Amino acid sequence: MIRVKREFTVKENALRLDLYLSGNFEVFTRSQIKRRNVEAFKKSNGKFLKIKLSKPVFKDDEILIEFDEESSQIDCLRPSNIPIAIIYEDSNVIVLNKPQGILSHPGISHWDDTVVNFLLYHIKSLKINFNEEKIRPGIVHRLDKDTSGVLICAKNISTLRFLAQQFKDKRTNKVYIAIVKGNFNSFFGSIESFIDRDKHNRKKFSVSKDRGKKALTEYRLLLNFGEYSLLALKPKTGRTHQLRVHMKYLNFPILGDEVYGRVDGSLKKITLMLHSYKLEIDVGKNSFKKFISEFPKRFVIFLSNFYKSDELNLIIDNLVLFLRDF
């Protein structure tokens, strides 16, 4: 048994917090709330203060809950046939083209609509193969909710450990593409820094002189257009929000980044322009494979504001050829 903390924002008014929990999160039935010793805290003036579960909550309230979690919760997860394209699959691994807007694994406010739920639907033996896992069966590495693209998952624990060790040892080649605000003035380069939790907002990360963990990102300019740039990014380390933090630090925030970017009223419909384009990794027995996703549609739509159709098609064809061996 472990003690777990989760934060969420209330989406609608409710007469009681416990009723809101049981009505919105499948894992918190009325009996589960009592059995798991749920305690609740509400943010007030920047601090979380303890409240009773019988208290009413209102839309946009920020709530922190603490509860007991069993060592294995995989049986609580439900399979879900989420539309996710499969790039590659064999008996040990499955490589997905994760859509934007889908979490890699369940969290307090997303229990049935994540990559894990898709894996449980698609791989019937997943629960048996990961019976010692909690709520992340098959997840080797993670993409943020609004980051799309290549995501490799394991079908059994031995493969998960084999793949995860390659990420840990930096023996993979990961290439992302991003559209950033501003014309990039360096053709190629790198940024190395420490990344730590932000002092003022614990949900964010920031570059630090000497605190946190070392992070290294290599970048390559692909295209300057209008007031924007298209970049290829290679994270040589795997820190949370690394690419987004490094681009902000360079003063070229990723377009559509509501956390690290600038608010631009003219671009309200633009979502995060960050895409996991390519992954090279050994899938077993020295079988190194290169997995490439499609050039994302939202990138094409945005670029079409600056180029005619024939010209844009040629540009994308050339980019695809370049990125294949980058």
From Swiss-Prot:
GO terms for molecular function: 23S rRNA pseudouridine(1911/1915/1917) synthase activity; RNA binding. It catalyses: uridine(1911/1915/1917) in 23S rRNA = pseudouridine(1911/1915/1917) in 23S rRNA. It is found in: Cytoplasm. Its EC number is 5.4.99.23. It holds the Pfam family PseudoU_synth_2. GO terms for cellular component: cytoplasm. GO terms for biological process: enzyme-directed rRNA pseudouridine synthesis. The keyword Acyltransferase does not apply. It comes from the Bacteria. Keywords: Cytoplasm, Isomerase, rRNA processing. InterPro entries: PsdUridine_synth_cat_dom_sf, PsdUridine_synth_RluA-like_CS, PsdUridine_synth_RluC/D, PsdUridine_synth_RsuA/RluA, RluA_PseudoU_synthase. Its main location: cytoplasm. The active site is at D144. NCBIfam families: rluA_subfam. Belongs to the pseudouridine synthase RluA family. Responsible for synthesis of pseudouridine from uracil at positions 1911, 1915 and 1917 in 23S ribosomal RNA. This is Ribosomal large subunit pseudouridine synthase D. The gene is rluD.
